[in-house]
Amino acid sequence: MSERALPVVVCGAAGRMGRLLLALAREDARLRVAGAVEAAGHAAIGRDAGDVAGGAPLGVRVGDALAAVCRAEQVVLDFTAPAATLAHARIAAERGAGLVIGTTGLDGGQQRELAALAARTRTVFAPNMSVGVTVLTELVSLAARLLDASFEAEVVELHHHAKKDAPSGTALALGRAVAAARGQDFEHTRRLAREGLVGERPRDEIGIMGLRAGDAVGDHTVVFG
């Protein structure tokens, strides 16, 4: 490992993404795991982070407080839950640490607070980090601009049964891309559920449907019709 490796702190260390991040950081000479954090009372507290990730020891114990390990030269990797993410972002902003956030399910108020905190330190916040979804978002935006308003837009997403939030952050981002391309206010045009006698669909409505089944990693479809 290089002496100049970037020190990272993994929040949600025992979760699906946390374990993956720990494993990837261990194999990447450009990174050094400087800390690992889990919720107070979690069974992983006190264990070696490498063991939690299912690999060789990293020499870093999982703790329950980001404030105990967060330093300005570090980058905090957070794929947890909205309330925890905001708490971690406050600490990182106060200490001057970088932030990479992939948490989804934040409401409007939480997103506004996160945006204010992000202005105080270097931050990447994205509901989906994949190149494919980034390209898809650009293509959806282009299609929404080229197709006139008579083409109604619907977003459908499918994820594994263990995903906690719905609809997915990626589905919401795709809906926002459609709204932005058409000059619409997404918060007023989105429709997250339909049931019963709902009447005729408004032309500017953007429907978003979340499906949960099996172990699907994540499928997203945008329909213009």
Protein language model features and the residues they cover:
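C-terminal substrate-binding/catalytic lobe of Rossmann-fold NAD(P)-dependent oxidoreductases
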Residues: 4-70, 149-225
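Short glycine-/small-residue-rich Rossmann-like dinucleotide-binding loops
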Residues: 80-81, 104, 210-212
